[in-house]
């Protein structure tokens, strides 16, 4: 919004193109077509957060591209890295462990209304969270309160524009006579 340029990169590609395709495709397939399986996996991750800790097989896989990530960031001269998922946050944490002299500002934007499993296993400068009502939850998960910023979730400007109910229904393909409710 202030004219800053932001490049978007798939952090899983630093592991490998095949790993990125595999992880992304299966993640999407499971949550779309097997939501109960996705929920079970998420609940398992919540109750066994140590599966993402440094030294575990999952951590080693997710952070295995840390050196390639470092080379990419260094060669492009980036000074601010923003993660929108915990997987790149873990890889970035490992990269910073391996290269502590690299001057960067790092942050994570939590796009869930909860502290996702393994968020606290990352070590970034800032954590942007959706609401002040979640400060306690993120602190309870192990994040330092001075690193938490309740900023809301960034959305496109068009979502701030009010439209009439009739226009909204027409835009969404909902019959004007249809009674509906949106729950979040």
Give the label of every model feature segment.
Residues 3-75:
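Conserved N-terminal ligand/cofactor-binding loop architecture of enzyme catalytic domains
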Residues 16, 89-91, 114-117, 135-136:
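Short, well-ordered alpha-helical microsegments
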Residues 72-79, 174-177:
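Glycine-rich phosphate-binding loop signature in dinucleotide/nucleotide-binding domains
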Residues 80-85, 89, 93-112:
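Active-site proximal beta-strand in glycosyltransferases
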Residues 101, 117-127:
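A conserved, positively charged/aromatic
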């Amino acid at each position: 919004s202030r004219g800053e340029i932001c490049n978007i990169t798939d952090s899983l590609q630093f592991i490998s193109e095949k790993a990125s395709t595999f992880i992304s495709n299966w993640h999407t397939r499971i949550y779309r077509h097997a939501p109960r399986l996705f929920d079970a996996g998420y609940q398992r991750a919540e109750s066994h957060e140590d599966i993402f800790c440094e030294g575990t097989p999952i951590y080693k896989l997710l952070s295995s591209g840390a050196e390639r990530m470092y080379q990419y960031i260094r060669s492009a001269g980036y000074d601010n890295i923003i993660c929108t998922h915990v997987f790149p946050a873990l890889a970035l944490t490992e990269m910073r462990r391996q290269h502590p002299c690299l001057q960067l500002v790092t942050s994570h934007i939590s796009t869930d209304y909860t502290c996702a499993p393994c968020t606290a296993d990352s070590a970034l400068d800032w954590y942007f969270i959706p609401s002040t009502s979640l400060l306690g939850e993120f602190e309870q998960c192990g994040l330092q309160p001075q690193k938490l910023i309740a900023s809301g979730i960034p959305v496109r400007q068009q979502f701030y524009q009010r439209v009439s109910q009739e226009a909204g229904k027409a835009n969404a393909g909902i019959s004007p006579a249809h009674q509906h409710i949106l729950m979040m």
